[in-house]
Amino acid sequence: MGKLFGTDGIRGKANVYPITPETALRVGKSIAHVFGAGDNTPKVVLGKDTRLSGYMLETALTSGLVSMGMNVLEVGPMPTPAVAHLTKSMGADCGIMITASHNPSDDNGIKIFSADGFKLPDDVESRIEHYILESERGNELQGSRRIGKAYRIDDARGRYIEFAKSSIKNHSLKGIKAVLDCANGAAYSIAPLIFRALGVEV
């Protein structure tokens, strides 16, 4: 197996190595291993776009993460910048976005953010990749009392809407009419809400 991480995470055809449930499980375990050092229970924000394979990968990643004692904050379909923002604002140790950005719909990928919402440093990415490729780490699973928990964050959209509004404070968009075509992408649900909250007639 060759190098997994490219310039923007791990990408490829869905259900073809490396974008498989088996690899996603190992990615989750490896992320939890790297970020799980210390006494506190680590937590990760996990989002996705609207690709069909996102549900499959979300389930596998979550299984790997919680099996190693990491708590998962699932925010559902959200734009990539929203997941980056929520990672920082919710005090997570890292964030994961399941997306292949502009790639065809039958592709998918796994993108990881550091606690500040930015791209992982190369050395951290290399450590995660090492554990994915070289170590099964099955003997390091947490005991049954230390398995992590997965939470669905119901107000994730509201949190990002408030952030978006605050980023253009003192500017009114009232009186503007807009037609939005989100192409069934990650912003399909939240974009109209943000524009309406800013006074736009959508």
Predicted stretch roles:
Residues 32, 39-116:
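Ferredoxin-reductase
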Residues 9, 48-50, 100, 199-202:
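Short, small-residue-rich loop/turn micro-motifs
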Residues 1-63, 67-68, 146-178:
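An N-terminal, well-structured beta->alpha segment
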Residues 21, 54-55, 81, 122, ...:
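Loop/helix-junction capping segments adjacent to catalytic residues or to phosphate/diphosphate-binding pockets
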Residues 4, 72-74, 95, 150-151, ...:
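Conserved beta-strand scaffold positions in the cores of enzyme catalytic domains, especially
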Residues 13, 108-202:
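Gly/Ser/Thr-enriched, mixed-charge loops and adjacent short helices
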